Structure formats: C-alpha cells, structure tokens
Amino acid sequence: MQATPVFIHTPYIKLDQLLKLESIIETGGQIKFILDDYVVLVNGEECTQKRKKIYPGDVVSIEGVGSWQVVAEEAEE
C-alpha cells in the first residue's frame, strides 16, 4: 500500500493531530478507540502512545484504514 503524503509546517505532528488532519478521527479523544481497536504502526513498530511525535519521514499505518508519510513542507521565500 502506498503511503499518502501528509505535509506539515512544524518540526513534528502528534499522532492524534495527524489522524484528525486526515479525517480518521473527529476529536482527539477518539484516538483511544483507534489504539484499542486497531494496530497502529509507526515506522513498522506498534505504537500505543496517543500523542506520539511523528517527524518528517515517519510512516504511520493502520491496517484496513490507511498509511501516511509525514513530509516537511518547504517554506516559501
């Protein structure tokens, strides 16, 4: 499965913010249900941290839901 790029303007994005940005969850509180019901992988390793910092180059995968790669958006000069 090809990872969908997620562009950020900050040094990192937290896992719950990433899933809200991608409309996987509507509120930050829903991350608990995702972590309880699905295996969430960050760079191939299982993640159970709601607010795990995800950096450019990191790949987040949720089986049956999708896969996303964080990309640093270049600042316009």
Please give the residue ranges for each predicted region.
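A detector for short, charged/polar N-terminal pre-domain segments
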Residues: 1-13
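C-terminal structural segments of small proteins and small subunits
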Residues: 49-77
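Low-complexity, intrinsically disordered short peptide segments enriched in small/polar/basic residues
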Residues: 3-5, 37, 59-62
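A generic "binding-loop/recognition-motif" signal
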Residues: 11, 38, 66
